[in-house]
Design a protein with these regions (language model features):
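Conserved beta-strand in the GNAT
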Residues: 58, 64-74
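Active-site rim helix/loop that mediates acceptor-substrate recognition in acyltransferases
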Residues: 19, 32-56, 60-61
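Conserved acetyl-CoA-binding loop of GNAT-fold acetyltransferases
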Residues: 138-146
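Conserved N-terminal entry element of GNAT/NAT acetyltransferase domains
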Residues: 1-13, 17, 21
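Conserved GNAT acetyl-CoA-binding A-motif
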Residues: 115-128
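Conserved acetyl-CoA-binding loop-helix of GNAT-fold acetyltransferases
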Residues: 94, 100-117, 138-139
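Short glycine/proline-centered loop/turn elements that form peptide/ligand docking sites
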Residues: 104, 108, 128-133
Length: 146
């Protein structure tokens, strides 16, 4: 059974790990070196988590944090999924042992529901064109924007 809890400031260290997982590259590349988390264009998605407007949830399976979906509003033009300065940019990651087990969709739907409740009319994300999670994003209402 999956439960959800709020991603809060006490989750800062584990959020870095989830951000690292979210930086997906097609096989055979595997995970990027952790040093990528020092890149300013990557750090913006997790650094100082808990700012006003940050929104995130953690998927908990049998008492274990399985992954998270988080969103942050950034200034226009900042971030790979930037649309404007009011639309949150979304990140999602599941620990490898919880991937491909049907957890991503309920996690994302719960996070999107909370975003709508917070007054966000839209949410953006960026994804590698070969990422196998694209059908999940489409089922959750995302579409391709050029």
């Amino acid at each position: 059974m999956i439960e959800f809890r709020t991603l809060d400031t006490s989750d800062q260290s584990v959020l870095w790990g989830w951000l690292h997982i979210a930086l997906w590259d097609p096989p055979p590349a595997g995970l990027r070196p952790r040093e990528v988390l020092h890149d300013p264009g990557v750090r913006i998605y997790a650094e100082g988590w808990g700012r006003p407007g940050d929104l995130g949830i953690v998927a908990v399976v049998n008492g274990v944090d399985a992954g998270a979906c988080w969103m942050r509003v950034l200034p226009e033009g900042v971030g790979l999924a930037s649309i404007d300065d009011t639309t949150p940019q979304l990140g999602i990651a599941l620990e490898p042992c919880y991937q491909h087990r049907g957890l991503g969709e309920p996690l994302m739907r719960e996070a999107l529901g909370r975003a709508w409740q917070a007054g966000h009319e839209k949410v953006s994300l960026t994804v590698h064109p070969e990422n196998p999670a694209i059908p999940l994003y489409e089922r959750c209402g995302f579409g391709k924007v050029e």
